Design a protein with these regions (language model features):
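Structural signal for hydrophobic/aromatic residues that build the beta-strand cores
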Residues: 1, 188, 208-210, 221, ...
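Switch/connector loops and helix/strand junctions flanking conserved nucleotide-binding motifs
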Residues: 2-8, 247-250, 288-291, 306-308, ...
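Conserved helicase ATPase core of P-loop NTP-dependent helicases/translocases
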Residues: 207-211, 217-223, 234-282
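Short, acidic/turn-prone active-site loops that include or flank metal/cofactor-
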Residues: 242, 302-307, 328-329
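Conserved RecA-like helicase motor core of SF1/SF2 enzymes
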Residues: 277, 283-319
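Conserved segment of the helicase C-terminal RecA-like domain
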Residues: 311-343
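Double-stranded RNA-binding/processing signature
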Residues: 345-393
Length: 393
C-alpha cells in the first residue's frame, strides 16, 4: 500500500513539518531499537502440568452430560424428521470436535498451561494451574452462581474431574523460582535490570511496559516478576488484560478473570504516579488508554502486524527511551521486523519529501472550490460576504 492509497482511503493528506522540523525533533524522542536473542531449550518438567495432562488426555467425551443429554434427545426424536437430523448433527459435531463446555474448557486450560511452561517456565505453570484449579473448584460448586451459563450437571461433571487432578501449591523458595524460570524469562529480567540502571544513571525514574500476546501468559509472567529474587524488591509490577471481550467467554478459562485483584483503572493510576514501574500487558495498552510515556517498551511476543509494532513502540516516548524485541535464537522473525522498519522509513521519506506530487489532491480541492463559488452569504448590517468554501462545517 503506497502513500497515495493511504491518503485516498483516509480522505486526507499526510503532511510533515518542514520549516520547524529541527525544533520539533527536540521534543519528539524516537526510542532506540534493541533486540534480545534467547535460546529456548526443551520445556522443563512441571509437576502440576504432568498431573493435569494425565487426566485431560484420557477424558471420554461420551461421559459429558451435554453428550448424554443429546443422545437422550435423539432417542426420543422420530427418525427422518428435521428435529432428529438437527440433534444428530449437533451430537456428531460435539463428539468429533470434543468442544463441549467442559472438554473445550479443560483443553484450553491445558494448552495455556503448556504454553506458559514453555515460555515462562515450570514455576509459573505450576502457579497458574494451581490458582485456576482453586478458582474452578469454587466456581463449579452448584451452589455458587459463578458459572451462570453452565448447567448443574455440567458443573458436577467438571468438579468430579477437577477433584481427580492432584496439584500442589508452588514453593516460594528463591532457588526454586530461579531454577524453574525459562531462558526467555531470564533474558527479560536481565534486560529490565540493565535498562533500569541505564535510565537511573541519568537521574530519571525507570518505567517499562512489557507486551505479551496471551492473557494467561500476562498473568503468569507478572506473578513471576513479583516473586523472582532478582526483581521482587526492584520492580513494582502490575498487569493489564483488557475488559470482557474474551475468546474464552463462557468457558472454564474465563475463570482467569478472578485472578485479577486490581482494576484496570487502579493499575494505570498507580503506573502514572510511580506506585508501579513495570506493567505487563496485552495489546490493550497499545492504544486507547491514557498511559504515560515510559522509558522502556519490551515485546515479549513479536507484534502480529505493523500497526501493533508502531503502536506499542509509540509508548516509549521519553528521552533516551528504548524499544526492545525478543527473538528466539535461530528463528526467522527478525525478517518481519526488518521489513516493517524498511516500510516505515519509506513512508516517512515519502511524506517528508517537499517535491512530492500532490497535484491529484490539489485538483480535487479545486473542483470542490469551483462547485462552491456561487454559494455566498452577505451580512446585511455590515455588508461583509462569506463564501461556503471558507466556512468550517
Amino acid at each position: 500500500m503506497n502513500t497515495r492509497t493511504i491518503e485516498s482511503n483516509l480522505d486526507s493528506i499526510i503532511r510533515s513539518p518542514r520549516r520547524h522540523r529541527s525544533e520539533l525533533a527536540l521534543f519528539v524522542h524516537r526510542p532506540v531499537f534493541k533486540h534480545i536473542m534467547y535460546y529456548q531449550p526443551e520445556p522443563l518438567f512441571s509437576t502440576n502440568l504432568a498431573s493435569l495432562l494425565s487426566i485431560v488426555n484420557v477424558l471420554d467425551i461420551e461421559d459429558d452430560p451435554y453428550v448424554i443429554n443429546l443422545r437422550h434427545q435423539l432417542k426420543k426424536a422420530t427418525r427422518g424428521t428435521a428435529d432428529y437430523h438437527r440433534i444428530d448433527q449437533k451430537l456428531s459435531k460435539v463428539i468429533q470436535k470434543r468442544n463441549s463446555f467442559t472438554h473445550k474448557g479443560l483443553q484450553d486450560f491445558l494448552r495455556a498451561a503448556q504454553d506458559i511452561c514453555a515460555d515462562v517456565g515450570p514455576w509459573a505453570a505450576d502457579w497458574f494451574i494451581y490458582q485456576v484449579m482453586e478458582k474452578a473448584r469454587h466456581a463449579a460448586n452448584p451452589y455458587n452462581n459463578i458459572m451462570s451459563t453452565w448447567k448443574n450437571k455440567e458443573k458436577e461433571y467438571l468438579l468430579t474431574i477437577l477433584n481427580s487432578i492432584i496439584v500442589s501449591p508452588v514453593s516460594f523458595c528463591e532457588v526454586d523460582i530461579t531454577e524453574d524460570s525459562s531462558e526467555k524469562a531470564k533474558a527479560l529480567i536481565e534486560c529490565l535490570l540493565k535498562e533500569k540502571v541505564e535510565t537511573e544513571s541519568h537521574d530519571d525514574p525507570y518505567s517499562a511496559i512489557i507486551f505479551v500476546q496471551r492473557r494467561d501468559a500476562v498473568i503468569a509472567l507478572a506473578e513471576l516478576l513479583k516473586h523472582h529474587p532478582l526483581t521482587k524488591d526492584v520492580f513494582r509490577v502490575g498487569f493489564l488484560i483488557g475488559s470482557s471481550d474474551s475468546a474464552y467467554r463462557h468457558s472454564m478459562m474465563d475463570i482467569t478473570r478472578n485472578l485479577v485483584k486490581e482494576s484496570q483503572d487502579d493499575t494505570i493510576a498507580d503506573f502514572k504516579i510511580g506506585e508501579k514501574n513495570v506493567i505487563v500487558s496485552t495489546s490493550v495498552a497499545e492504544e486507547g488508554l491514557d498511559i504515560q510515556a515510559c522509558c522502556s517498551v519490551i515485546r515479549w511476543d513479536l507484534p502480529p502486524n505493523m500497526a501493533s509494532w508502531a503502536q506499542s513502540r509509540g509508548r516509549a516516548r521519553k528521552k533516551r527511551s528504548t524499544f526492545t524485541v525478543m527473538f528466539e535464537e535461530g528463528s526467522k522473525q527478525k525478517e518481519d521486523i526488518a521489513k516493517w522498519e524498511n516500510l516505515e522509513r519509506e513512508m516517512v521519506a515519502l511524506y517528508s519529501d517537499p517535491s512530492r506530487d500532490l497535484s491529484h489532491i490539489q485538483d480535487e480541492e479545486q473542483d470542490i472550490s469551483d462547485d462552491d463559488n456561487d454559494m455566498e452569504f452577505q451580512v446585511a448590517s455590515t455588508g461583509s460576504v462569506w463564501f461556503a468554501s471558507l466556512l468550517v462545517q
